[in-house]
């Protein structure tokens, strides 16, 4: 097999877990329309069917990070692919609401695990020059999975075949299981375990030959300086600001409302006045736009930088949601405002998927030292899943109590807050190796802590 072919297969299969996450997230919006035909649903149980995936994801995120730091990225991907298959088939063959909810929890374990692990694996496999571009592949796979789910829902809706909708998630899961044969272990994890020659062999596939020895030297130097355990690193005071930034990124990525659009797009369009068929087309349009803008982000992220994209993204999503809310508040619901809803949500998707959607997945693993990258990324992904769960549970209640216009106004205020967070808190990591980022952040936050201590000592004297 040619070197370039092997390299692209590594990247493709490394990111495939993102497609499964996207599919399992998006498919439930169509399946919910017909589950009630076989399994009676109440308002409560319908909410549980959606949200239990996210509950499972919280635990999956926490477990996969620590496990991948201990046993390696590749072995954990193998386990996750099996859980994906079991969860998808269990959902398809569920006969009671209890079985369906339990199956969604199992599926959520794999969803959360892949959400935490895929960005780490891609960031550690990528050469510095294209790490941002490659890191956005995770989000590209997520939105591609969502689009596939929308298409499958559309195709199977005439047959009311919800079991096929959810069960087809097993197909890419089997593909991931096969693809593990092409996925080597992360070179950084191997260096951490003392397997330098194996790391060099893998980097010969993925890296420019002239950069290999320099990057290996950086990895070895970084590991030589790390005598602490994973838990010890996470407890270190200098890493707390990094964790807070990671947690902030995770919360804002979800709190600006993206998954309410993914989960409830048909409901939003129907509330805004569109018919069933038009709502389905509008939803599919959002799925296509997701993919297009994520590809745009892949082109921009290593040229423009992470921080600038987040800042401009916050401006765009704030204005689009505020404008949408203003139109609905002043003009009410009509045929014209229904299509304006589609347009403004489209603008929102353009800005979100070119910025906050993919950039957060790239930044989270970049922020943390290699000794604790899996565990720290797992923790921030846990927070992301929890924020996703809270927003998805609260959205229907807000929609019922406030109306769609005021709901979008609330999200626009949160988007405005994300601007200040990105501007003042988020560091730029473009063009730096993971070891350079770690050294820079450690110096920045240790220096800040040292300055604070000096001021306190002077005041005491």
From Swiss-Prot:
Official protein name in the record: Probable metabolite transport protein CsbC
Q: Which Gene3D superfamilies match?
A: MFS general substrate transporter like domains (1.20.1250.20)
Lineage here is: Bacteria, Bacillati, Bacillota, Bacilli, Bacillales
Location in the cell reads: Cell membrane
Q: Kindly state a single biological-process term from the GO annotations of this entry.
A: D-glucose transmembrane transport
Gene source species? Bacillus subtilis (strain 168)
Query: Quick check: keyword Ion transport in the entry?
Result: no
Q: Which PANTHER family match?
A: PROTON MYO-INOSITOL COTRANSPORTER
Q: Name one Pfam family in it.
A: Sugar_tr
Residue numbers on the Extracellular membrane side: 36-38, 98-104, 161-163, 263-280, 330-341, 400-402
Q: What is its main location?
A: membrane
Query: What is known about what this protein does?
Result: Could serve either a nutritional or an osmotic protection function.
Q: How does it sit in the membrane?
A: Multi-pass membrane protein
Family matches, as InterPro entries: MFS_dom, MFS_sugar_transport-like, MFS_trans_sf, Myo-inositol_Transporter, Sugar/inositol_transpt, Sugar_transporter_CS, XylE-like
**GO cellular component terms, semicolon-separated:** membrane; plasma membrane
To which protein family does this belong? Belongs to the major facilitator superfamily. Sugar transporter (TC 2.A.1.1) family.
Could you tell me the keywords of this UniProt record?
Cell membrane, Membrane, Transmembrane, Transmembrane helix, Transport
Q: Which GO terms describe its molecular function?
A: D-glucose transmembrane transporter activity
């Amino acid at each position: 097999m040619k070197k370039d072919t092997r390299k692209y297969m590594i990247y493709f299969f490394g990111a495939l877990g993102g497609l499964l996450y996207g599919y399992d997230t998006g498919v439930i919006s169509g399946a919910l329309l017909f589950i009630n035909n076989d399994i009676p649903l109440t308002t409560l149980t319908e909410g549980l069917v959606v949200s239990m995936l996210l509950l499972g994801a919280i635990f999956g995120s926490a477990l996969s990070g620590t496990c991948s730091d201990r046993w390696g990225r590749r072995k954990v991907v193998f386990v996750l692919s099996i859980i994906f298959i079991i969860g998808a088939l269990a959902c398809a063959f569920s006969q009671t609401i209890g079985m369906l909810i339990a199956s969604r929890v199992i599926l959520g374990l794999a969803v959360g695990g892949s959400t935490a692990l895929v960005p780490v694996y891609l960031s550690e496999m990528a050469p510095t020059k294209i790490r941002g571009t490659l890191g956005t592949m995770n989000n590209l796979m997520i939105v591609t999975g969502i689009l596939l789910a929308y298409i499958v829902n559309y195709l199977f809706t005439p047959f009311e075949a919800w079991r096929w909708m959810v069960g087809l998630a097993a197909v890419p899961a089997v593909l991931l299981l096969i693809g593990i044969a092409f996925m080597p272990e992360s070179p950084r994890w191997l260096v951490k375990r003392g397997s330098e020659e194996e790391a060099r062999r893998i980097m010969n596939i993925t890296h420019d030959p002239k950069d290999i020895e320099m990057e290996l030297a950086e990895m070895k130097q970084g590991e030589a300086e790390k005598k602490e355990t994973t838990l010890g690193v996470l407890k270190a005071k200098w890493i707390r600001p990094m964790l807070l930034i990671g947690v902030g990124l995770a919360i804002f990525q979800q709190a600006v409302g993206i998954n309410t659009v993914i989960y409830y797009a048909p409901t939003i369009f129907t509330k805004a006045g569109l018919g069933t068929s038009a709502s389905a087309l509008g939803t599919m349009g959002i799925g296509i736009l997701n993919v297009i803008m994520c590809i745009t982000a892949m082109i921009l992220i290593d040229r423009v930088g992470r921080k600038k994209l987040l800042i401009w993204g916050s401006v765009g999503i704030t204005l689009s949601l505020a404008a949408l809310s203003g139109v609905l508040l002043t003009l009410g619901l009509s045929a014209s405002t229904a299509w304006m809803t589609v347009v403004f949500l489209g603008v929102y998707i353009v800005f979100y998927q070119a910025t906050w959607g993919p950039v957060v997945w790239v930044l989270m693993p970049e922020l943390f030292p290699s000794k604790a990258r899996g565990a720290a990324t797992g923790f921030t992904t846990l927070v992301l899943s929890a924020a996703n769960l809270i927003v998805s549970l609260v959205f229907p209640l807000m929609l019922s109590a406030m109306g769609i216009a005021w709901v979008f106004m609330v999200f626009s205020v949160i988007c405005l807050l994300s601007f200040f967070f990105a501007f003042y808190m988020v560091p730029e990591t473009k063009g730096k190796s993971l070891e350079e980022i770690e050294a820079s952040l450690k110096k920045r936050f240790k220096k800040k802590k040292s300055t604070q201590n000096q001021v306190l000592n002077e005041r005491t004297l």
